[in-house]
């Protein structure tokens, strides 16, 4: 069986499933590898799916079922198994591998991954986080279009090496239809898929992709509120730490995996100690991306001080 070699989010991956969006490598060392393969789920899992159960989590094993797409089993921080449904949408099947499955792998490995896009600014990584619909991908796309380099679209995988670093993801972004229209992208030339009843498009960002880790300097949380103009405020102390924890990718599942252990919590503290955290509040139903970028460039880029 021919395997595809990838390096994504700091993970060495050998995959039976070809994922075109990932950067392919000729060779990869065999130790500490994540394998991705097609498989057949156990009778126990199949029985639970028949009973209507769609996800099951334990310390070292997570499986979940997506109707008409596939069943996925993620185990021991090093294995992803996929059983396809009949006539499955292969593009959507791979999206779950790229996002949720690798997110669960990182949780099992106690790697802190923050839900957000990552842009290189002033030679450092800046994470843009926030709730769904806050405008993360729109803002990171606008920054990329302005010439800033790009590390990751939706997941910021971190590593502590005295200070926190963000590991590169893959050189594509997922954009909704309105963002495609705002940036004048050709929808016909992009792969599309349906996610939560919304059409998403996969946009090539290879020309601005950064393939090496970058030191993390800022996290910016985007918030939509009933306000008239874009404002910015800094979070400090425990509020900063709490917001990091609240925005962990797939963090809602940590309590089902034995809770947050001391090592994982210490990584969150180390991130908080070494970065600044800002909240940008923007009005709903207005396209304020240019204003947000102006504010970020004027107020935040080049700021050296870290306030704990």
Task: Label each region the model flagged.
Residues 133:
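Walker A (P-loop) phosphate-binding loop of P-loop NTPases
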Residues 136:
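Conserved lysine of the Walker
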Residues 109-123:
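Phosphate-binding P-loop
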Residues 95-112:
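N-terminal pre-Walker A segment at the start of P-loop NTPase domains
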């Amino acid at each position: 069986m021919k395997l595809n070699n990838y390096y994504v989010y700091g993970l060495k991956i050998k995959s039976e499933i070809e994922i075109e969006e990932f950067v392919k490598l000729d060779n990869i060392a065999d130790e500490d590898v994540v394998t991705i393969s097609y498989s057949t789920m156990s009778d126990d899992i199949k029985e639970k799916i028949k009973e209507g159960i769609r996800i099951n989590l334990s310390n070292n094993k997570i499986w979940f079922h997506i109707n008409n797409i596939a069943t996925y089993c993620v185990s021991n921080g090093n294995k992803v198994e996929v059983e396809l449904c009949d006539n499955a949408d292969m593009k959507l099947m791979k999206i779950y591998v790229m996002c949720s499955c690798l997110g669960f792998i990182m949780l099992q490995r106690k790697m802190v991954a923050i839900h957000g896009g990552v842009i290189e600014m002033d030679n450092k990584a800046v994470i843009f986080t926030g709730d769904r619909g806050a405008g993360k991908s729109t803002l990171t796309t606008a920054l990329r279009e302005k010439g800033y380099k790009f590390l990751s679209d939706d997941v910021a995988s971190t590593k502590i090496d005295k200070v926190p670093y963000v590991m590169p993801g893959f050189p594509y972004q997922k954009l909704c239809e309105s963002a495609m229209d705002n940036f004048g992208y050709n929808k016909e030339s992009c792969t599309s898929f349906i996610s939560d009843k919304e059409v998403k498009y996969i946009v090539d960002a290879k020309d601005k992709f950064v393939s090496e880790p970058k030191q993390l300097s800022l996290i910016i949380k985007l918030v939509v509120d009933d306000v008239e103009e874009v404002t910015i405020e800094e979070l400090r102390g425990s509020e900063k730490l709490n917001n990091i924890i609240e925005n962990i990718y797939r963090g809602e599942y940590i309590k089902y995996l034995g809770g947050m252990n001391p090592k994982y919590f210490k990584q969150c503290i180390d991130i908080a100690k070494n970065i600044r955290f800002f909240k940008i509040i923007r009005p709903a139903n207005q396209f304020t991306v240019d204003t947000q970028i102006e504010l970020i460039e004027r107020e935040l880029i080049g700021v050296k001080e870290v306030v704990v």
